[in-house]
Amino acid sequence: MLDIKRLRQDFEGIKEKLAHRGEDLSALDRFPQLEEKRRDLINEVEVKKAKRNEATKQIAELKRNKEDAEGPILETRRLGDEIKLLDEELREVEAELNLILLSIPNIPHESTPIGETEDDNVTIREIGTKPEFDFEPKQHWDVMEDLQIVDVERAGKVTGSRFVFYKGLGARLERALINFMMDLHSDEHGYAEVLPPYMVNRDSMTGTGQLPKFEEDAFKVADTNYFLVPTAEVPVTNMHREEILPETQLPIAYTAYSANFRSEAGSAGRDTRGLIRQHQFNKVELVRFVKPEESYEQLELLTGHAEEVLKRLGLPYQVLSMCTADLGFTAAKKYDIEVWMPAQGVYREISSCSNFEDFQARRAGIRFRRDANAKPEFVHTLNGSGLAVGRTVAAILENYQQADGSVVIPEVLRPYMGGKEKIEMPN
């Protein structure tokens, strides 16, 4: 959520910056009119309250003098009724203003590239050596089906499309990756491990920016106030909703594994095979709460932590600075990390690392105090995938596949796989 004071002071300047996102900002056009109406209503209420106070004093004076006070009494009742109606109208205007604020995206940071499409994203660095094959590499869905480490058909029977059963060494590889990522982030990168709920309430989804704008993308539990988590970012960030943190606790860093649930409402026909786009998928998340003056340094740190997973797995990747049109609703600056998929001949997103500045903290009421007498300030929140597990499985299957159909297990995962070095073709 944007700072309403800043919006009042620099409406045209903010609107110009938001226009670089290329989104529909028609709701924002009502802000000046509603803000003027809000001020007028507040002034009118104050005038009527002053008149009512004056009438109340008259009543007291008349009663002291044992004179007729019926006129002022009727006047206070009339003014009270009018104030009540104005207060109700003011609440409606403020609710509409709040809805506008909740629907406006974050202001892009000055370092975010200005662009109109994903083609305007800027490549920051490419890391690793792409594998060379003396055979035609297979797509990861063919690799895993040939190895019989997933069962898509039965998942379709049990649930539907965009679900998968991992089995055997496929299930173990998924679990190995989760444990490896969590160990790396908690033991070496200094994140505190949490295991969050898989359901959250509406306030939590609003706090991190999924609601109200993206409700159609979420899975809501019928006849309840609960949503299945689209990412562990939601429960973990909301751990500190409506809290004032002491400065000495910052930065706070959490890592969390969770299953994630997304409707993929706008993805019909895209990535219908394989592990890239599932309704349910596992992900390891990184979340940081930091002081405002440190947040961009902290974004580089967090992004490096996500990259380290790929480096240790030996997977080639690139880092992109996302342009204004491809930034996402809540981010002021975002890096996407994309892993090389040799059979597809493209890089595919495996992590997004974002600085939300105070956008989420303002929605969720997450503040800190620099000392006991200081006024509370909003923290800056950051998050990133560290990493999406299914997509990491897909990348390993494509990059480590062998001519005989087997897949070499990255060395760093072997302790988590009982020392096994390969996933062999079944007999």
From Swiss-Prot:
Single GO cellular component term: cytoplasm
Catalytic activity: tRNA(Ser) + L-serine + ATP = L-seryl-tRNA(Ser) + AMP + diphosphate + H(+); tRNA(Sec) + L-serine + ATP = L-seryl-tRNA(Sec) + AMP + diphosphate + H(+)
Record InterPro entries: aa-tRNA-synt_IIb (IPR002314), aa-tRNA-synth_II (IPR006195), aa-tRNA-synth_II/BPL/LPL (IPR045864), Ser-tRNA-ligase_type_1 (IPR002317), Ser-tRNA-synth_1_N (IPR015866), SerRS_1_N_sf (IPR042103), SerRS_core (IPR033729), tRNA-bd_arm (IPR010978)
Primary enzyme class: ligase
GO molecular function per UniProt: ATP binding; catalytic activity, acting on a protein; serine-tRNA ligase activity; transferase activity
Pathway: Aminoacyl-tRNA biosynthesis; selenocysteinyl-tRNA(Sec) biosynthesis; L-seryl-tRNA(Sec) from L-serine and tRNA(Sec): step 1/1
Entries under Pfam families matching the protein: Seryl_tRNA_N (PF02403), tRNA-synt_2b (PF00587)
Binding residues for L-serine: 231-233, 285, 385
GO biological process, alphabetically ordered: selenocysteine biosynthetic process; seryl-tRNA aminoacylation
Subcellular location(s) per record: Cytoplasm
Annotated positions binding ATP: 262-264, 349-352
Top-rank taxon: Bacteria
Primary localization: cytoplasm
Sorted UniProt keywords: Aminoacyl-tRNA synthetase, ATP-binding, Cytoplasm, Ligase, Nucleotide-binding, Protein biosynthesis
Enzyme Commission no: 6.1.1.11
Comment text on domains: Consists of two distinct domains, a catalytic core and a N-terminal extension that is involved in tRNA binding.
Stated family: Belongs to the class-II aminoacyl-tRNA synthetase family. Type-1 seryl-tRNA synthetase subfamily.
UniProt function note: Catalyzes the attachment of serine to tRNA(Ser). Is also able to aminoacylate tRNA(Sec) with serine, to form the misacylated tRNA L-seryl-tRNA(Sec), which will be further converted into selenocysteinyl-tRNA(Sec).
Name of the protein in question: Serine--tRNA ligase
Record organism: Exiguobacterium sp. (strain ATCC BAA-1283 / AT1b)
Gene name of the encoded protein: serS
